[in-house]
C-alpha cells in the first residue's frame, strides 16, 4: 500500500532535515599589530573562543540557524589577532514532534554548520599570516543545556523581582 506518491505511509511521516542553503553572513579578521605580531613568539598565545547559536523561524517548517564564533589570540596582554564569523544555514524540518523541534534546531543544525565555519576560520587565520586555527569540536548538546539553564535562571530571577 502506498500514500499516492509511491512511498509507503510510514515513509511519508519519517522525520526530515534538509539543508536548503548555507552562507557567510559576516566575517571579520583583524591583525592590528602586524607586522610585529607575525614575528616568532617566546610563548604560545592565549586563545579565547566564544560560540553562540541563534535561530529564526522563516516559515512553518523552515528555520535560519546562525552560528556565531568569536575569537581572540593574545600574548602577554597584547592582541595578536581577532576574528568574528556569523555562518548561517536555512533548514527545512518536517515530521518532527513539536517538543523535539527546538532541540533539533539548536543542536543538530549548528552541528551540521560547524565543519564549514571551522574551515572558514582556519583559512582566515592562515591568510592573516598565522598557522591555521583548527577549532576543537563543539558539544552542541552541552551548549544547548547551558543556554536552557541560563534562560530558566533568568526567568526565575525575573519572577522573583516582580512585585506581589
Curated annotation (Swiss-Prot):
Keyword Cytoplasm: yes
Top-level taxon of origin: Bacteria
GO MF annotations in UniProt: unfolded protein binding
Alphabetical GO biological process terms: protein folding; protein tetramerization; protein transport
Keyword flag Protein transport: yes
Stored InterPro entries: SecB, SecB-like_sf
A cellular component annotation (GO) from this entry: cytoplasm
Function statement: One of the proteins required for the normal export of preproteins out of the cell cytoplasm. It is a molecular chaperone that binds to a subset of precursor proteins, maintaining them in a translocation-competent state. It also specifically binds to its receptor SecA.
Oligomer and partners: Homotetramer, a dimer of dimers. One homotetramer interacts with 1 SecA dimer.
Family in the record: Belongs to the SecB family.
Protein's name in the database: Protein-export protein SecB
Native organism: Rhodopseudomonas palustris (strain BisB18)
